[in-house]
A protein has these predicted regions:
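Short acidic/histidine-rich active-site segments
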Residues: 231-235
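Alpha/beta enzyme core
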Residues: 3-13, 25-50, 56-74, 84-85, ...
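Active-site glycine-centered loops adjacent to acidic/histidine catalytic or metal-binding residues
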Residues: 80, 230
Length: 243
């Protein structure tokens, strides 16, 4: 099953396709085996920061491990966060990374332009969506600011952020963004927190996050495409079920 078909089917049935990151290469085998044992459709994924700052080695290394253990009925391979501006606020030459992913056999890719202006994010995402579709794979994009990668996840006043909806995906921007970019899935900011990766806070405990369920419903209605939740670990379980 193609990733695009799997996610669309899950969306239509009001369920999810879970995705598991591989920051350390030996995780690929047990994650793939667990997915197959459970007979559920799920993704293995790796983000750029996981070969830059952790031990997944490269997107090609993860793909090589994936294809040793995968089952096409259940497992999918996704390239997670490829930022245009990374967590250290440096510009990334992102297109060659996406091209490598296509060659390695990834079924979907994510471009993260969330640190760009809205206009730049739209233009960049449109470019990547066209590239992905020309190669027969799906494109995920991000709009809004999911906290945590820069270290804010451990020290933030979470209650204040949730109350004010700071960084949450704007409804009107989301409607325009999806219409103009052609992305297949949209990663949204609705209360979750990325794990912090900055030195000094990496090992601190995340706050227990929750989700703004009404905001999710509004975003789903206004965009008309599947939404993606990042920072899923540490969220109140009932919020996950409700979302």
């Amino acid at each position: 099953m193609k990733a695009q078909e799997a996610v669309k089917l899950a969306w239509q049935h009001h369920t999810i396709v879970p995705a598991f990151n591989i920051p350390y290469l030996p995780m690929a085998k047990p994650v793939a085996q667990a997915i197959i044992d459970e007979k559920t459709v799920a993704m293995l994924q790796v983000a750029r920061l996981e070969w830059e700052k952790f031990e997944s080695r490269s997107l090609e290394a993860v793909a090589e491990e994936y294809f040793k253990y995968y089952d096409p009925k259940y497992t999918l391979l996704h390239l997670d966060h490829v930022p245009v501006i990374d967590e250290d606020h440096k510009r990334v030459d992102f297109m060659p990374i996406l091209e490598r992913a296509v060659k390695a056999g990834y079924q979907s890719v994510m471009v993260d332009g969330s640190r760009l202006s809205l206009e730049e994010n739209i233009a960049t995402t449109k470019q990547v969506a066209e590239f992905a579709h020309a190669n027969g794979i799906a494109c995920e994009a991000e709009l809004g600011s999911v906290m945590g990668h820069e270290g804010s996840g451990a020290n933030m006043d979470y209650e204040e952020i949730f109350r004010t909806k700071k960084g949450f995906t704007d409804l009107n921007e989301a409607k325009r963004f999806t219409a103009e970019t052609g992305c297949d899935w949209l990663s949204v900011a609705v209360g979750s927190i990325h794990g912090a990766i900055a030195d000094g806070v990496r090992n601190q405990k995340k706050p227990e996050a929750r989700l703004d369920i009404q905001h999710i419903a509004d975003l789903s209605k206004i965009t008309g495409i599947p939404l993606v939740l990042h920072g899923g670990s540490g969220i109140n379980n009932q919020c996950i079920l409700d979302g």
